[in-house]
Amino acid sequence: MNINKIALIYNHNSKHLAIIEEIKQLYNYCKIEEAEVIIVIGGDGELLHNIHRYMHLNIPFYGVNLGSLGFLMNPLDTKKLLQNIHESTVSILNPLLMQVEDTSGQIYTALAINEVSIFRKTNQAAKFRIEVNGIERMSELVADGALVATPAGSSAYNLSASGPILPLESNMLCLTPICSFRPRRWHGALLLSSATIKFEILNTNKRPVNATADFQEFNNITNVTVKSTKDKPVKLLFNKNHTLEDRIIKEQFGG
């Protein structure tokens, strides 16, 4: 990948400003709108926020990890930064499109790179009905919540909720309950990425529920519809010896 114009994004309150200044001195940068690659320095959260902010530009993102986990990031190598970008591999992520309706009848939409999650708002467990492609698959799930994860997001919140990790090219989605009470033995489902999943919230007055698409939260919802969309693909760049697919495989073996 031959790259000449790069943009740099970082948190100006970062505790790593000395390292960031070193990177700034080594390379020339342009405005984000003129860039061929957007470099995001920080952690997964910083990268996700900026993907949501700039994904409409259809410019590849290259993350440099100065956070803790950095699953979607590349290791820091200031001297070889440009070389690593030139030699990088591209992973295409298709986000989830979430549509929610709240108790006032307002309808909202949002995109998620990792997952869409719904969860109880009070100490009362949530109750909801689940449809897949217009067919009722579960008349009542009683749980703290549930989530739908992409392959890229399957190793994040989904894994913590005991969901499976999906290979990046699997064209699948994870539907995973969060602390399921009834049915107690239900551990979720693997669905084709073409599936449309709908959650209808039951007893919303007594058991209010919120929904999130990555970090965007919506309160007091009555139903949620989730599906994958190929209309807004996100390109992530990874070092050739540190690909996202390799990391997903490694995570499955306790790496």
Swiss-Prot record:
GO terms for cellular component: cytoplasm. Transmembrane segments: none annotated. This is NAD kinase. Keywords: ATP-binding, Cytoplasm, Kinase, NAD, NADP, Nucleotide-binding, Transferase. PANTHER family: NAD KINASE (PTHR20275:SF0). One of its GO terms (biological process) is NAD metabolic process. It comes from Rickettsia africae (strain ESF-5). It catalyses: NAD(+) + ATP = ADP + NADP(+) + H(+). NAD(+) binds at D44, G45, H49, N114, E115, D144, A152, S155, A156, Y157, N158, L159, S160, Q216.
